[in-house]
Amino acid sequence: MNVNIKNLVHAFSKLPSLGPSSSRRLVIHLLQNKEKVMLPLASLIKELADLIIECEVCGNLDTKSPCSICTNPKRDTKLLCVVEELGDLWAFEKGNIYSGLYHVLGGRLSAINGIGPKELNLDTILKRVTESKIEEIIIAINPTLEGQVTAQYIIELLKNLDVKISRLACGIPMGGEIDYLDEGTLRIALTSRQEYELNIK
């Protein structure tokens, strides 16, 4: 195999859900469809790399910061949905089931992987709540063990503030990923969300 082709296969194999075999098939398809697929795709990737930036407010990706969601006057600024990854935000937006604002953490707390609060967009939640008119925080974090630890950290961070903290309702299986849920399940989980019972001493 040509070394340049081999390097491209290796680069694709680093992407989520793409192993060596699927990466090879993808590269072959691109090379065999250079004019129709490969060159337009390369142009789009280059354009996105030049234009897309991270929103300084919520962590979304857009061509401007603050992003189009944060600056949309039609969004409900009293609601803040906290999600792990950008894909979770897109899942809510795709279903058109939520009209509030978002806060993308960029992952979840993981002692094994060395990911602590400083590695995530966590402490900025406190600043957003204290400096805005947010009335409810919806914790939409994947129901994994690490997700539960992250959710508890957020609750401890905000429990003394005058803000409602809720979570998605049952329906999302333990270990499930919000990004992979169908629109109906996600809608029910959101509309039937439950408020956390805080024991403040």
Curated annotation (Swiss-Prot):
Task: Give one GO term, molecular function aspect.
Answer: zinc ion binding
Asked if Transcription regulation is a keyword of the record, the answer is no
Q: Which Gene3D superfamilies match?
A: 3.40.1360.10, 6.10.250.240, RecR Domain 1
Keyword terms of this UniProt record:
DNA damage, DNA recombination, DNA repair, Metal-binding, Zinc, Zinc-finger
Could you tell me which Pfam families the record lists for this protein? RecR_C, RecR_HhH, RecR_ZnF, Toprim_4
**Zinc finger annotations (C4-type) as residue ranges:** 55-70
Which PANTHER family does this entry report, sorted A to Z? RECOMBINATION PROTEIN RECR
Describe the task this protein carries out.
Answer: May play a role in DNA repair. It seems to be involved in an RecBC-independent recombinational process of DNA repair. It may act with RecF and RecO.
Q: Which family does it belong to?
A: Belongs to the RecR family.
Question: What HAMAP family does the record point to?
Answer: RecR
* UniProt protein name: Recombination protein RecR
Organism, scientific name: Wolbachia pipientis wMel
Gene coding for it: recR
